[in-house]
């Protein structure tokens, strides 16, 4: 005989609502803020009065508030339980007036601390002073393992630069295999502990990548770096597929983006001795292309389906069937619509799947924007060549790229993408100022004063933009002007980058 199921009901509170000369009893939830049902309560009260033949609530919407019977205003952002309202209490619906809401006063410090502690610990734990739990111990252990892995990595790379022996690679690979075994044990035994699996997995990927890079003979170079970066990309993709968490997907995408760019640079350096400036120019152009392709790549990764075309009569106009390309639909005839078993049954994803795809698209976009923003300062550093014949052209290329990064941020609705691009552009500006300051002759004026003034002016400009742009509604002509300036900057950037990289000279000769 099975035990009966227990059903939990939300806490309720029966109160009397008084308005003018009318009194009505209503039952409200006691555990949610009053704001959630306040407007509905007024509408029900108004309908009840009109049903009984009275005039109803004469106050306009949004111009009333609740008071206790003694005239104390109630804060509708809090629940009835937090406000101390009990069953049988009378609340008065009155016009809104100026003033502050009621706040409970405590006669002693101990009473106030006790009440605050009770509120902080209402979810089952004291959030003011978090105790040491098993989760804390596990995360501390992972931090200790990460410290040990860092020491092993440093010693492995140091030893590999000195000797061509396979011992460093074997040592790093052996410890990496142990971490892989630990990740598999967590995956099989405690599948819900994604944090431990991620910790073991990322540390194992780093160790195995270093081991793979150190294994081939010869002095460490571009070929060794390419091998290690490929291992990191494969390991990151494996972790992302296994965990399927939103933040983990963003981290994996950022790692794959950065390592993919570095792998492309290493592959070029394997076959041709390309200068750092030329590589940096190519990276800058590639970063702009990646930013423009971010939505397309995210949609491709998430496998977003085309929209479903229906009619207001409820009959499908177009539908997709199994075996058709994802970007095509077929018209649905009346005979097909009446047949329940026809092969034109629409297979478009429903609401839950669309929401999951949207989260995946957002995570991929965040990762790509973060990865590109991490590479941008290094690329700007490589492009700039102070006190060289074409230094002004390099400065122009870097400045146009930074400006395009900032303007591209307005194309992303989510905050993390835009913030990542703007922060990456700002870091690139600081990197450029730092390179010019370090390259100038040692002196107070050129090495400190002018760079500090420039950085301070740039920060002040950023603060002014942050205060003005979000609160201002710009006219269409201004937005159109910004778009045209962005197009002109792109048109000027490509020839300047080609001239700086020597493409025109190479074509001429």
Swiss-Prot record:
Q: Which UniProt keywords apply?
A: Cell membrane, Membrane, Transmembrane, Transmembrane helix
Q: Its quaternary structure?
A: Part of the ESX-2 / type VII secretion system (T7SS), which is composed of cytosolic and membrane components.
Record's keyword annotation contains Nucleotide-binding: no
Anything else of interest in the record? Was identified as a high-confidence drug target.
Q: Which residues cross the membrane?
A: 135-155, 170-190, 196-216, 222-242, 248-268, 281-301, 364-384, 389-409, 418-438, 449-469, 487-507
Q: Does the keyword Flavoprotein apply?
A: no
> Its GO CC terms?
plasma membrane
Q: Which domain of life is it from?
A: Bacteria
- Where does this protein come from, organism-wise? Mycobacterium tuberculosis (strain ATCC 25618 / H37Rv)
Q: Which family does it belong to?
A: Belongs to the EccD/Snm4 family.
Q: Where does the record say this protein resides? A: Cell membrane
Q: What GO terms in the biological process aspect are recorded for it? A: symbiont-mediated evasion of host immune response
InterPro entries in UniProt: EccD_transm (IPR044049), T7SS_EccD (IPR006707), YukD-like (IPR024962)
Residue ranges the record marks as coiled coil: none
Q: Where is this protein chiefly located?
A: membrane
Query: What NCBIfam families does the record tag this protein with?
Result: T7SS_EccD (TIGR03920)
Q: What is this protein called?
A: ESX-2 secretion system protein eccD2
> What Pfam families does this protein's entry cite?
EccD, YukD
- Membrane topology field: Multi-pass membrane protein
């Amino acid at each position: 005989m099975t035990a009966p199921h227990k059903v939990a009901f939300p806490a309720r509170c029966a109160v009397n609502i008084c308005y003018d000369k009318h009194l009505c009893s209503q039952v409200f939830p006691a555990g949610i803020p009053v704001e959630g049902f306040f407007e509905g309560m007024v509408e029900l009260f108004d309908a009840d009065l009109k049903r009984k033949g009275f005039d109803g609530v004469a106050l306009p919407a949004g111009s009333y508030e609740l008071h206790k019977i003694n005239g104390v205003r109630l804060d509708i952002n809090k629940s009835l339980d937090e406000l101390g309202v009990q069953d049988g209490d009378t609340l008065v619906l009155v016009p809104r007036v100026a003033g502050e809401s009621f706040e409970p006063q405590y006669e002693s410090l101990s009473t106030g601390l006790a009440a605050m502690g009770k509120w902080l610990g209402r979810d089952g734990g004291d959030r003011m002073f978090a105790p040491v739990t098993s989760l804390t111990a596990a995360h501390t252990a992972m931090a200790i393992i990460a410290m040990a892995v860092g020491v092993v990595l440093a010693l492995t790379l140091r030893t590999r630069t000195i000797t061509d022996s396979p011992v460093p690679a074997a040592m790093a690979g052996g410890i990496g295999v142990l971490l892989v075994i630990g990740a598999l044990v967590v995956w099989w035994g405690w599948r819900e502990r994604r944090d431990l699996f991620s910790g073991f997995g990322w540390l194992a990927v780093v160790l195995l990548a270093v081991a793979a890079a150190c294994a081939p003979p010869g002095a460490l170079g571009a070929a060794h770096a390419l091998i290690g970066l490929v291992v990191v990309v494969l390991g990151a993709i494996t972790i992302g597929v296994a965990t399927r968490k939103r933040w983990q997907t963003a981290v994996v995408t950022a790692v794959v983006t950065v390592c993919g760019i570095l792998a492309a640079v290493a592959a070029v350096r394997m076959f041709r001795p390309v200068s750092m400036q030329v590589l940096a120019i190519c990276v800058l152009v590639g970063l702009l292309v990646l930013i423009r392709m971010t939505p397309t790549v995210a949609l491709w990764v998430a496998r977003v389906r085309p929209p479903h075309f229906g009619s207001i009569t409820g009959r499908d106009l177009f539908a997709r069937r199994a075996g058709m390309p994802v970007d095509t639909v077929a018209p649905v005839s009346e005979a097909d619509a009446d047949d329940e078993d026809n092969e034109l049954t629409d297979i478009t994803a429903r609401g839950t799947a669309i929401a999951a795809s949207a989260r995946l698209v957002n995570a991929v976009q965040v990762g790509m924007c973060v990865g590109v923003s991490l590479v941008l300062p290094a690329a700007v550093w490589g492009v700039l060549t102070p006190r060289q014949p074409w230094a002004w052209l390099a400065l122009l290329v870097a400045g146009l790229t930074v400006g395009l990064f900032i303007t591209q941020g307005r194309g992303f609705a989510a905050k993390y993408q835009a913030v990542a691009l703007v922060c990456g552009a700002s870091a690139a500006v600081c990197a450029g100022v730092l390179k010019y300051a370090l390259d100038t002759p040692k002196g107070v004026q050129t090495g400190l004063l002018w760079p500090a003034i420039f950085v301070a002016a740039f920060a002040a400009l950023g603060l002014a933009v942050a205060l003005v742009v979000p609160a201002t509604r710009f006219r269409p002509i201004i937005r159109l002007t910004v778009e045209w300036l962005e197009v002109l900057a792109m048109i000027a950037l490509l020839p300047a980058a080609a001239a700086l990289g020597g493409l025109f000279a190479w074509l001429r000769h």
